[in-house]
Amino acid sequence: MRIDGERQLDIWFEFQCVDATGPSRLAVPLQNRVSPFVELCAFCARGLFMGNRGGRFHSDAKTLTARRWASRQWICCILDFKSRRRDVWGRFYTELFFLDEPTALAAGHRPCFECRRKDAQTFAEKWREARRLNRPPHAPEMDDVLHHERLRGGAKRLHRRNIDDLPDAAFAAFDQTAFAIQGDTLLRWTPNGYHSRKPRPHRISVDVLTPPTILAVLSAGYKPRWHQSAKE
């Protein structure tokens, strides 16, 4: 039986956030929601995309190990692909979830070439344009660049930039809070959506969460999918 993306996400949400006594009593969710700071958090919140970091890095008890990735292949996937059903945090992958694509990009995840081939090809072509390459980069080439840009040791690598140079969908940090750029507006990121719109300042330097090459891809015209709260 095919389950559409919204319903499939509901099933995963229920699996992770409701214990055996029923929906009125919440259990501790899995630590699998990704923030723009790369962090893996445990909260009951729906999102638009799932993904992984190259394999499994959780225990049989469905808790995180000391690692936060399995390989450099950090990808962002759609929720429903060919009606596949998965046991979340089963034998093979540590599934992760994102509020939306700008969030995934800020954390350094690129579009998946299997379930999001068209988006991945567009992303690679915009990468080629931005870096003036002779051909679009292959996935491992992008993964090597992004791995260096998204992390410093095991922590998030921040990049200092002028806020006027940032494209839409880029993320910047203000007082340890993530804000997304949308035109002349800053949108405060939360696990449940964007809140607290405020005017975008000008002529200041900020700590940018989105990796530099992804900033270039966004500037070249790649259009990520926003959470609906960004339009409200």
Could you say what each language-model-derived stretch is?
Residues R2, L9-E232:
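Mature, structured domains enriched in cysteine- and short glycine motifs
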